[in-house]
Swiss-Prot record:
It comes from Geobacter sulfurreducens (strain ATCC 51573 / DSM 12127 / PCA). This is Phosphoribosyl-AMP cyclohydrolase. The gene is hisI. One of its GO terms (biological process) is L-histidine biosynthetic process. HAMAP family: HisI. Pfam families: PRA-CH.
Length: 125
């Protein structure tokens, strides 16, 4: 039986989130054992925020939730790929569909996407 190795990175593993239909990488976040279990049990993606030191469910503020379609681990069992159905227009807190909208081009980083929503309107605190 395979067991996910949370010890290599101090209790966390990287979680690569992909669109299940297109395989587009939507985001990368971190999970601990609790958030991986919450994800597997609920069918929604849950993560551990290193900057806020708290658990969060994707879409809890924006409504842009993610429904889990498939979960895979790598050969070392220290990372996961989670294929999801993205609900709402965007996975990124910037309003872009994917967090990977900045491309290295001609010696500089260039944004290649327009936000699909205004984060200031969605994340009012």
């Amino acid at each position: 039986m395979i067991t996910i190795d949370f010890q290599k990175m101090g209790g966390l593993i990287p979680a690569i989130i992909q669109d299940h239909a297109t395989n587009e990488v939507l985001m990368v976040a971190f999970m601990d054992e609790k958030t991986l279990n919450l994800t597997l049990e609920s069918g929604k993606t849950w993560f551990f925020s290193r900057s806020r030191n708290k658990y969060w469910m994707k879409g809890e503020e924006s409504g842009n939730t993610q429904e889990v379609v498939e979960v895979l681990t790598d050969c070392d069992a220290d990372a996961v790929v989670i294929k999801v159905k993205q609900n709402g227009p965007a996975a990124c807190h910037t309003g872009n569909r994917s967090c990977f909208y900045v491309r290295w081009e001609d010696g500089q980083w260039v944004e290649h996407s327009e936000p699909l929503f205004d984060p200031a309107e969605v994340y009012k605190k």
